[in-house]
Amino acid sequence: IAAGAYDYTLGRGTGANHGNWYLTSSKNTSMPEQDVHNNDLRPEAGTYTTNLVAANTMFVTRLHERLGQTQYVDAITGEPKATSMWMRHEGGHNRWRDGSGQLKTQSNRYVIQLGGDIAQWDWGGTNRWHLGVMAGYGNNHSSTGAVRTGYHSKGSVNGYSTGLYATWYADDETHNGAYLDTWAQYGWFDNHVKGDGLPGESWKSKGLTASLETGYAWKIGEFSSNYGNLNEWYVQPQAQLVWMGVKADELYESNGTLIESTGDGNVHTRLGVKTWIKRLNKMDDGKSREFSPFVEVNWLHNTRDFGVRMNGEPVYQDGTRNIGEVKTGVEGQINPHLNLWGNVRVQVGDKGYNDTSAML
């Protein structure tokens, strides 16, 4: 029997209570105790939480994940022009546990975003502002298992986002020096959850996410290889603040349980440093071709834990207050018409939290 945040089973009493039958939600007591560390949590709590986390995080992006400006020839006039159109694909896998350790959740996601500048202006010199629009689609599929009961639940969230971004470079030609990037997106999502032996539930979530990011890049040295290729070494400290305001609608399950989301309004902080080597191959002279392998290390902090209240009983995601991240990849200009960049990212937190993703 599922009620509130817990699963209950019918069991015979012991000792003097052998002739009585009880609904229990604990290994050690014959009567349920309202304590998430003693009672048997429903796996659906993990699925509700995962959907909320995915809706708040799947469209979070960084400047270098959508950076690039390429040249093309106008088909009508034949004149060379520049375009800032970009597209990013990301796939990821995530694992985490709840605060009691009873629920284990894993999920897989896919996200596509695209956008481009709609205006640019400068204040003289090489500095320049970029104003752009972006939109995206993403989905996340998850499974949660309850360690004590062996019950499982599955969930999914599918959604769209649209928003604006603005970026300033102190040097728009080389992207050295300081930069400032900000964006805001509105997202709306369809959610589903299905527990073992229970009717499926559906609800919607929606809300705003916004970001402010800054950094400073400088060249700390250069060296030549034995083949005469020039290598330039860069370092860039970065900082980013993301406000996450996607909130799920209240839901009454078929059994009457009230489902409320928690954790919206979380402020996600990222502090880190990126270093890369820009390789200028002698064979590519005059071909506008260059490659930059990079490594990035970040510390991530969240001010709130995402979770759910089921008839007022809280269940939350654990291990995400402080997360370490390592990211490596390559950014390259194939020719004047095409830039490509890709990376692999690993995040590790407390209590078994981890996330792995790849982006192109």
Residue locations for each model-derived region?
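Short acidic/polar capping segments at secondary-structure boundaries
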Residues: 185-189, 240-246
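Outer membrane beta-barrel transmembrane domains
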Residues: 160-163, 238, 245, 254-360
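Intrinsically disordered, low-complexity Ser/Thr- and acidic-rich flexible linkers and loops
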Residues: 223-228, 283-285
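Outer membrane beta-barrel translocator domains of Type V secretion systems
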Residues: 26-226, 343-345, 350-359
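Hydrophobic beta-strand residues in large extracellular and virion-surface proteins
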Residues: 23, 210-212, 271, 295
